[in-house]
Amino acid sequence: MTSEQSIPDITATPAWEALRKHHDQIGETHLRQIFADDPNRGHDLTVTVGDLYIDYSKHRITRDTISLLVDLARTANLEAHRDQMFAGAHINTSEDRAVLHTALRLPRDAELIVDGRNVVEDVHAVLDAMGDFTDRLRSGEWTGATGKRISTVVNIGIGGSDLGPVMVYQALRHYADAGISARFVSNVDPADLIATLADLDPATTLFIVASKTFSTLETLTNATAARRWLTDALGDAAVSQHFVAVSTNRRLVDDFGINTDNMFGFWDWVGGRYSVDSAIGLSVMAAIGREAFADFLSGFHIVDEHFRTAPLESNAPALLGLIGLWYSNFLGAQSRAVLPYSNDLARFAAYLQQLTMESNGKSTRADGTAVTTDTGEIYWGEPGTNGQHAFYQLLHQGTRLVPADFIGFSQPIDDLPTVEGTGSMHDLLMSNFFAQTQVLAFGKTAEEIAAEGTPAAVVPHKVMPGNRPSTSILANRLTPSVLGQLIALYEHQVFTEGVVWGIDSFDQWGVELGKTQAKALLPVITSDGSPQRQSDSSTDALVRRYRTQRGRTG
């Protein structure tokens, strides 16, 4: 498919109309009734993928809903689009690129020919180079300019070059075992870099500058400031031993002072938000080692193979993506809460925000025509139990429908006994997980509350309406492989929704104009003379006020 080819409007198909009529039929049927009518759904509406046990029974769907959603996916040719992606077809139509993040986790003996090259060989050549480098770093063979071993790596990137590594490093902190810690700088706000470097020793710090083009404004601004910090302490010659690059622009990397032997590349068929398992993950590999990083990749591949081969009726990413679409397009939900009951996954929701919102936040279909329905889910969330004391009130008793994903683990990485000595703190955490999904689904009626002797005036305030849907994802333990499985599970949900909506989930033109305008405004707010008048009165007034408060001519 190219962008010039017309895409059928999915909302004008019989499959869409069948779902609309089905919604009218089941209406606001409560999950209490749905479970009463189908008591085995808690066992039947589950799927196991790798180490992930996924329970989607607490959704406002029936078995007929699932059948109709699968019909919709087949009407949109989801399986054909999926096969094209895995084969390396240029499904990113607006940029005429293949979409091959799945190739980043193919085993070494696999073969995938794209544009005349076996990309698996290229992928593993980079992985081998990353492994050799991080082995030297972790063993102490690689030292800084003074001969001291490196103890801290600072990743400088933004967007996909930051959100993924930050999230994964925190999630897998227990696998960092070589005396190397990682820190991350992304924001061009100088407070980010200053706070990160405040207690570091230049002699034991290594910077990883992650920018495909090596021209990203925020990243290069931070990298230049970090280089100044280093050279002020150790001299210009130290740069080659304290900076490496993740980039494809050899000339600019060399101009910066980084030895191009220490440049780790990737490809234009890897989008930033899908790149944490590429060389962008170098900081993660430095911390956890090449073996654990290989386990991380193997987890992705497990779910990739499931998505590639499983029938849609039992295909976890496809089903969850279609259920998300059901809420977005037929029940009016605008967001999804991601609620990991693991503090190590504190950054998972932020990571998924870029994955889904940059991918599917589109109002134009791949053929250039306007979409005819809402697209894109707004992801947000915090770890349990923190969220319970912040925003769960709205989930339980508010007027907005917010489907939620609960993610938990049977075996904790850390645990402590409770004061009472019964069970452990992890057991307490997970009892909250199970309780919240149960109360969201089934609630508590006015009659039940009144029967407890609650004053009549208070009863309405304590009613828990229920009928609030959720997915429960349970794994044994948070390991590198399990984390890879979780990420791939959401990647393919995003793909599923994008195909049905007919959009290009792999471009991001919406971020470009703001960057261009920022470059144009920088000399306006910094020039010595009176600034050029802006095209609108609001921006003009803001610029002039800022200049005045900075001591420049208004």
UniProtKB/Swiss-Prot annotation:
Catalysed reaction per UniProt? alpha-D-glucose 6-phosphate = beta-D-fructose 6-phosphate
Which stretches are tagged as biased composition: Polar residues? 527-540
| Pathway this chain belongs to | Carbohydrate biosynthesis; gluconeogenesis; Carbohydrate degradation; glycolysis; D-glyceraldehyde 3-phosphate and glycerone phosphate from D-glucose: step 2/4
Q: Name one GO biological process term.
A: glucose 6-phosphate metabolic process
**Which residue intervals are annotated with compositional bias (Basic residues) in the record?**
544-554
- InterPro entries listed in its UniProt record: G6P_Isomerase (IPR001672), G6P_Isomerase_C (IPR023096), Phosphoglucose_isomerase_CS (IPR018189), SIS_dom_sf (IPR046348), SIS_PGI_1 (IPR035476), SIS_PGI_2 (IPR035482)
Q: Which GO terms describe its molecular function?
A: carbohydrate derivative binding; glucose-6-phosphate isomerase activity; monosaccharide binding
Localization: Cytoplasm
Main location (coarse class): cytoplasm
Q: What is its EC number?
A: 5.3.1.9
Its biological purpose is as follows: Catalyzes the reversible isomerization of glucose-6-phosphate to fructose-6-phosphate.
Similarity comment: Belongs to the GPI family.
Protein's UniProt name: Glucose-6-phosphate isomerase
- Organism, scientific name: Mycobacterium marinum (strain ATCC BAA-535 / M)
Instruction: Give the lineage.
Output: Bacteria, Bacillati, Actinomycetota, Actinomycetes, Mycobacteriales
Task: Point out the gene that encodes the protein.
Answer: pgi
